[in-house]
Amino acid sequence: MKEKIVIALGGNAIQTTEATAEAQQTAIRCAMQNLKPLFDSPARIVISHGNGPQIGSLLIQQAKSNSDTTPAMPLDTCGAMSQGMIGYWLETEINRILTEMNSDRTVGTIVTRVEVDKDDPRFDNPTKPIGPFYTKEEVEELQKEQPDSVFKEDAGRGYRKVVASPLPQSILEHQLIRTLADGKNIVIACGGGGIPVIKKENTYEGVEAVIDKDFASEKLATLIEADTLMILTNVENVFINFNEPNQQQIDDIDVATLKKYAAQGKFVEGSMLPKIEAAIRFVESGENKKVIITNLEQAYEALIGNKGTHIHM
């Protein structure tokens, strides 16, 4: 059976100084060119992606247009909107590449829900800032309308709403994603970490939270029984003691050593550490699992073993 890969795109894949749709589509076009050799390979491919800047813009738009006739949409709905928007952009550019290659592969996006535990202790300590900045006076008014919401000062720039970042428990659409990926389809899923939902009797209900995209990508890779999780970020390799005089590049490492480095605080919290934690979970999820961490430009070279950081048992 051909290798199955989950590619977790970092925010730099859609990074641009302009927030227009055209500018973001151009950034994605350039990003996808780096993945062209993978699309031309026999590998079965699922792509996940971030949505930070995009959902931030959506939330600001919702706040500014909020009225009785155009009420602001909640965070889970905005997450779904961003998945559709970015998925559409990715589909367009990947389809362009597949057509140029005369490939018979197809590409599609699955709006993805991710189940979280309503009793996750992270709900008691919201830390993820979202949406626009507010003044102290604006926050006082908002608290009257949203008594359960939490606002925190953000580096002297004003106040922002903060939400929880619970751990993913399951991917509701994972069987569909697996079926599509096992065919000739390139599947885009788990955008922005997925839409967080909790079980309510015989259905699921969206909650106001943001799931770490690396943790969601790991959970997806585990559930669809992928062979490789490739996490694409803005550096070619993982380093211990990054940006310090004694920084050291890691090319190949086993999980036991990686755990030791993580326990010693060798990785930056909120930056490389979540990627390391996701990597450890995936490698330990089954036999012969591997994780590659590198940048977008070196994705194919890393896949064939020439670049990047390779993590294994």
Curated annotation (Swiss-Prot):
<keyword id="KW-0547">Nucleotide-binding</keyword>
<dbReference type="GO" id="GO:0005829">
    <property type="term" value="C:cytosol"/>
</dbReference>
<keyword id="KW-0808">Transferase</keyword>
<dbReference type="InterPro" id="IPR001048">
    <property type="entry name" value="Asp/Glu/Uridylate_kinase"/>
</dbReference>
<keyword id="KW-0418">Kinase</keyword>
<dbReference type="GO" id="GO:0005524">
    <property type="term" value="F:ATP binding"/>
</dbReference>
<comment type="pathway">
    <text>Metabolic intermediate metabolism; carbamoyl phosphate degradation; CO(2) and NH(3) from carbamoyl phosphate: step 1/1.</text>
</comment>
<keyword id="KW-0067">ATP-binding</keyword>
<keyword id="KW-0963">Cytoplasm</keyword>
<dbReference type="GO" id="GO:0019546">
    <property type="term" value="P:arginine deiminase pathway"/>
</dbReference>
<protein>
    <recommendedName>
        <fullName>Carbamate kinase 2</fullName>
        <ecNumber>2.7.2.2</ecNumber>
    </recommendedName>
</protein>
<comment type="similarity">
    <text>Belongs to the carbamate kinase family.</text>
</comment>
<dbReference type="InterPro" id="IPR003964">
    <property type="entry name" value="Carb_kinase"/>
</dbReference>
<dbReference type="GO" id="GO:0008804">
    <property type="term" value="F:carbamate kinase activity"/>
</dbReference>
<keyword id="KW-0056">Arginine metabolism</keyword>
<dbReference type="InterPro" id="IPR036393">
    <property type="entry name" value="AceGlu_kinase-like_sf"/>
</dbReference>
<dbReference type="Pfam" id="PF00696">
    <property type="entry name" value="AA_kinase"/>
</dbReference>
